A protein has these predicted regions:
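Conserved beta-loop-alpha segment that forms the PLP phosphate-binding cup at the N-terminus of a helix
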Residues: 73, 92-120
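A short helix->loop->beta-strand "cap" motif at the edges of active sites that frequently abuts
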Residues: 118, 139, 201-204
Length: 224
């Protein structure tokens, strides 16, 4: 027996308008970052997955809570070694938190830093989901223009000075310095040091998104 209830009367008053019914990908698809399906080594993946299941199957079939809320420790140890080797940082497995994708990571960061009405600095063109997540919790993203080397640091300083003159201090600066989304630019190392100087001068932390940082084919990966 179905209940005759008008559920829309229980919805939040500030919900966004319903999206259009799904009709398939557009002709030029920029939805999601993924490899060309023809290049995926399916046979090698099957072999690797089979080996892991034989070795860790019982652990993988359960929640694995024995490793604590930060996630599966062997994976955290692997990630910490990779970060130390490739990004120039020095971290341990205890500094790593496993999340269900970048969306959950962004939500946790926003929950830790932001209140409704706060301001966050972002690149003028940036990861759409990051912007939407800020707006959804009542945070105002302030965009700074880009060039072929990433965020314009001169304009970033101008924007910060203008906001501070109005007694507005952004909670953090969200940037994608390596293979920027959607521009694809890579911030030079000298600019990275300048960005750190800006962060120190204005006492505003940086949230660095390195989703595509491994996709560099013709040069070494710059430091985080």
């Amino acid at each position: 027996m179905a209940l005759d209830i008008e559920y829309s009367t229980f919805f939040k008053s500030d919900l966004p308008a319903p999206s259009q019914r799904w009709s398939g990908f557009p002709e030029y698809n920029f939805i999601g970052g993924h490899n060309d399906a023809e290049t995926i080594p399916v046979d090698d993946m099957i072999k690797s997955i089979s080996e892991v299941l034989k070795r860790e199957g019982k652990t993988l079939a359960t929640y694995g809570l024995q490793h604590g809320p930060q996630g599966y420790k062997p994976l955290r140890e692997f990630i910490s070694k990779k970060v130390n080797k490739r990004s120039g940082l020095s971290v341990s497995s205890d500094d790593i938190l496993i999340t269900s994708g970048s969306g959950q990571a962004l939500d946790l960061i926003n929950a830790a830093f932001c209140n409704p009405g706060d301001t966050v600095i972002v690149e003028q063109f940036s990861y759409g989901s990051a912007i939407n997540r800020l707006r959804r919790i009542g945070v105002k993203p302030i965009g700074v223009p880009l060039n072929d080397e990433g965020i314009r640091l001169d304009l970033l300083v101008e924007r910060l000075e203008d906001l501070l003159d109005k007694s507005i201090k952004p909670k953090f600066i969200y940037v994608i310095p390596t293979v920027q989304n959607p521009a694809g630019s890579i911030m030079p190392e000298k600019n990275r040091f300048k960005l750190l100087e800006v962060s120190k001068k204005f006492q505003i932390p940086i949230v660095e998104d390195e989703c595509y940082a491994d996709l560099i084919w013709d040069s070494s990966r710059p430091p985080a």
